[in-house]
């Protein structure tokens, strides 16, 4: 165990440490044993495999993933961000709702397609996206203006990602990520 703690009847009964394995026990064999016993799990990028906390738990990992993809695929130096780059993706649900904000933090202009307008309402109201539209032309216009200016933005497009990608292809819009 991570530790033993004095508590009372109203105290939480689980202290989450995800996959924290230290010292002599920091190897794959011991992790697999602890996971099989149900006392450790692989936490990935969020608050842990035992809980769901929505986009705030994934925004940092998504931001890092976008920056690293830019560095790996686009040759962006470690001291630069995604300014002047266009990121396209889909989904503004629970976990995917972080994509627009992560792209903005990373400096990219982005369009995130989502077919469920209620998801867009939520993300727009909460500030996870900065623009919303159901027009392919308007979504592209906003994102491309921001991209050209080197300014970040997150455009929520209410529609299918396939329609968005076809539109961008037909209009010779280069998608960086």
Residue ranges and their predicted role:
Residues 1-83:
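Glycine/serine-rich phosphate-binding loop and adjoining beta1-alpha1 elements at the start
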Residues 10-12, 16, 62, 120, ...:
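Generic structural signal of hydrophobic/aromatic residues within well-ordered alpha-helices
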Residues 44-50, 54-64, 83-86, 92-152, ...:
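Catalytic or ion-translocation cores adjacent to nucleophile or general acid/base/metal-coordination motifs
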Residues 70-82, 152, 159-175:
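Non-transmembrane, aqueous-exposed alpha-helical and coiled segments at domain scale
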